[in-house]
Structure formats: C-alpha cells, structure tokens
C-alpha cells in the first residue's frame, strides 16, 4: 500500500495540477501562454477514471493535489514557463522585424 501511495504522489507531482482548477476552465478557454493545459487535462481524466473505480482513491488524489507542496511546484512551473514563453515571443518579433526590415519582405 505504501508503494501505491508513493506512486500516486509521484504522479500528482509529475502532472503538477490541482483538480478543481481543471474543471473550472476548458481547453479552448485557456490562453496561448498556458503550457499547463495538457497536464491539467490529463490529471482531470485520471481523476475522473479513478473516481469511477474508487471514490476513496479519488478523494486521496484530490487531497494530495491540494497540498502546498504540489501547489507550490505547479505555481513555480507556471511562472517559469510564462517567462520562457514571453522571451520566445520577443525573439520571434525581433526575427520578424529583421526579416521585414533587412530583406524587405
């Protein structure tokens, strides 16, 4: 049983999500910069599948996903991926301006 709990905790940390946030927004409602769309959706599907088999295990998943450690890790990932996305968008704009300015396209 201990290995099962460790596996579930590792899965939740890997997905870095909180289940209630997944249900609050659909995939199409999210912005371009939100890289957490796919882990959130996957966590939602896993939660729903576990809930149909064992509501008690689903409640355990929900409790683990709402811990401060998981929320902190998720917030860190969101913050860092947002920074990376902004930098990539700035780089693309610079490349476009060089392309249009120097080459005249």
From Swiss-Prot:
Entries under InterPro entries matching the protein: Apo-VLDL-II
Induction pattern: By steroids (estrogen).
Tissue: Produced by the liver, secreted into the blood and then sequestred by receptor mediated endocytosis into growing oocytes.
Cleavable signal peptide: 1-24
A single Gene Ontology CC term: chylomicron
One of the GO BP terms on file: lipid metabolic process
GO MF annotations in UniProt: enzyme inhibitor activity; nutrient reservoir activity
Alphabetized UniProt keyword annotations: Signal, Storage protein, VLDL
Keyword ATP-binding carried by entry: no
Subunit annotation: Monomer.
Record-stated family: Belongs to the apovitellenin family.
Function: Protein component of the very low density lipoprotein (VLDL) of egg-laying females. Potent lipoprotein lipase inhibitor, preventing the loss of triglycerides from VLDL on their way from the liver to the growing oocytes.
The protein's name in its UniProt record: Apovitellenin-1
